[in-house]
Amino acid sequence: MRRSAAPSQLQGNSFKKPKFIPPGRSNPGLNEEITKLNPDIKLFEGVAINNTFLPSQNDLRICSLNLPSEESTREINNRDNCSGKYCFEAPTLATLDPPHTVHSAPKEVAVSKEQEEKSDSLVKYFSVVWCKPSKKKHKKWEGDAVLIVKGKSFILKNLEGKDIGRGIGYKFKELEKIEEGQTLMICGKEIEVMGVISPDDFSSGRCFQLGGGSTAISHSSQVARKCFSNPFKSVCKPSSKENRQNDFQNCKPRHDPYTPNSLVMPRPDKNHQWVFNKNCFPLVDVVIDPYLVYHLRPHQKEGIIFLYECVMGMRMNGRCGAILADEMGLGKTLQCISLIWTLQCQGPYGGKPVIKKTLIVTPGSLVNNWKKEFQKWLGSERIKIFTVDQDHKVEEFIKSIFYSVLIISYEMLLRSLDQIKNIKFDLLICDEGHRLKNSAIKTTTALISLSCEKRIILTGTPIQNDLQEFFALIDFVNPGILGSLSSYRKIYEEPIILSREPSASEEEKELGERRAAELTCLTGLFILRRTQEIINKYLPPKIENVVFCRPGALQIELYRKLLNSQVVRFCLQGLLENSPHLICIGALKKLCNHPCLLFNSIKEKECSSTCDKNEEKSLYKGLLSVFPADYNPLLFTEKESGKLQVLSKLLAVIHELRPTEKVVLVSNYTQTLNILQEVCKRHGYAYTRLDGQTPISQRQQIVDGFNSQHSSFFIFLLSSKAGGVGLNLIGGSHLILYDIDWNPATDIQAMSRVWRDGQKYPVHIYRLLTTGTIEEKIYQRQISKQGLCGAVVDLTKTSEHIQFSVEELKNLFTLHESSDCVTHDLLDCECTGEEVHTGDSLEKFIVSRDCQLGPHHQKSNSLKPLSMSQLKQWKHFSGDHLNLTDPFLERITENVSFIFQNITTQATGT
């Protein structure tokens, strides 16, 4: 009987039928037929098992490291640049199969107990095709699947990892004899065994990748089309062959690849040439502009090569997407500008440019910053940049033939989507692309609708603790590389999350680790992340301080009153729904910043006749009686807030000791910025401000004015929500983070605004926390669960929304009045804070790569995300025994209960 082709075997050439071979050529003899029909004799004894369904994990073609040759990269040495190829070999279709033995029911075979125990521990995996039961000779198979045989039971999974059949009751000899070509009836489905899957391929998940996650090149979109040739051309003109020969002779690199320190891109291999060079153009070296190379640092040169290989489809079988996840301050913008300028002028095939038009989508506050960077590195004549704002519409870009780069904000993109869809962009760059972590939002949907295959995501923010967010980013740059979302969850997310559970078995842990490793291998080829350690030697020292401030008397009294409210008590008993705990948390955070913020909220709720939030009104009940009778929030005092009191003294000390240095003052809330602005006015500090109300067209001008050496501003008031991402504020050398956010990435981004390339002064960072309050609890959650240093993805699953157990809420809604620092108490540190404490030894955790989902071969000595154990290695100072050498901190000790300090020096980077 001729075996019908499986769906997976017909992909790409479904109309081609297997060659027919007469049955007589390979018809088994009569003795073989009798042997196969005898149940007491081993089935298919002479047939070898074909194990070529998927390559094993040891196959060097999987995630192989193809470093560029010396010819193609003459300037870059000693770099770790992997170029992986996924070679999946389809099993050879047999032209004539041996007779099939259809098992419709288990057979009665005597089995010893020893054999049964042995069979229970035996697990086998098979690739199969399945269909509904049919008596037709040539069956129509409905899909591919994976058959898992363990002992006397089996599980049938489709290529999305979903169970489509289970069974038990077969004798172990029945299941032990399963071989290629055998037909079985399982759960109302008829299956045919196509081959054996190795345990490595199953545990890594590679056996599921033949389906939706195929990395094959789409020929309809990738293959170069031949240009139209006019059949009525003049016979007097030179032939196309002669023209092509002339073109070949004139094909030379734009820049000399043999000059010292030249940066030459890798040449495409033969497979790439076969797909993308149908016209047989000569290979030409692609050389980065020497002017740009002169200013590039080694890690930036590596990043340009990485991006070039990704968008050219050299790293992954024609896939043209990339994620550049370098930490803040490593020059992602310059790397992209170099790539755009290179691809717009050069190409590996005949020197023809690879791209014509580029779309850059960025947060509104960075639109003008991108334009400024283009002008800085390329001038205003070499490349024409068009930025979209209220005065400059997309229609102007469409009408003009001079502009080649369109820079637009995410908000303006949604408004102008219809016009942008009509433009053919060859390259799409999404700055701060971590906002695309949800594939269902309008922004992501709009960008996906653009017909542009070359896509780059830039993000300095770690992708936060959600594998589905990670999938959304991966699927955006390289659609379908991980299959559908449902298959991704079954094959990768669920096993990985299950392996992290405390109750996970050893088998589940091993499976989760293997799936995580395979996910790392798949995605590491187009994800590049470097930490800030690689530029530490170029930066001045950084002194980071976590300052715990004692709350004021009014704050303590109000805090107690809030914790004793009926709403908080019901929260702790789990009696209320609709997340009232979030209202309580918000009220406590306002109180930590300043009591006047809480006073304003109480007054607003009392005056609001349409307010339906009874819980919030109940929470504020009786709080007004705690305030003085004549309390006026506009006439607030600094002593009412412990943090504001410390801030006021700190600003005065900096202004006195370093009058030429500037301060960046950051808050998450506009109302808090209003208070800080009033403090600046009272003390006569010159300030500028950037928040959500600042027009986008003015933001870059404000930043440039602050960074200018001739600026008279002393303080830059910054909203972390509006301007905490991407801004370069190297004009300031002191950064004060007034409040804390649940998302550690928000704080990290804000703190990275000043310690960047170009900073001339030592950087001082101060994080102000109210001792014993909810702010300290949030800080503990940051460093113990998520860390202060990013990874591309945290494989421990936590909820995207703020959800707490009753025990966690009890911890949050507790005021520790007797402790100078609850965080220090949790460290079990033996120091008393009377002198500098640096721990027994500074532990450095060696990790195999800079990000959890990155190439295994990239070694790094970078520290892991800051944990409670690492915080123990910081310097500890008690407020009662402050022996500080820091000239700023030693003069603000009056209301400080504890200080953690860490110094990153230029020499050691620690």
Swiss-Prot record:
- Every copy of the Helicase C-terminal domain together lies at 649-810
For the region Disordered, give the residue spans: 1-33
- The principal localisation class reads nucleus
One GO biological-process annotation of the entry reads: response to ionizing radiation
Q: Where in the cell is it found?
A: Nucleus
Q: Which Pfam families match?
A: Helicase_C, SNF2-rel_dom
PROSITE patterns documented for this protein: HELICASE_ATP_BIND_1, HELICASE_CTER
Q: What protein does this entry describe?
A: DNA repair and recombination protein RAD54B
* Species whose genome carries this gene: Homo sapiens (Human)
Classification from the root reads: Eukaryota, Metazoa, Chordata, Craniata, Vertebrata
**What gene is it encoded by?**
RAD54B
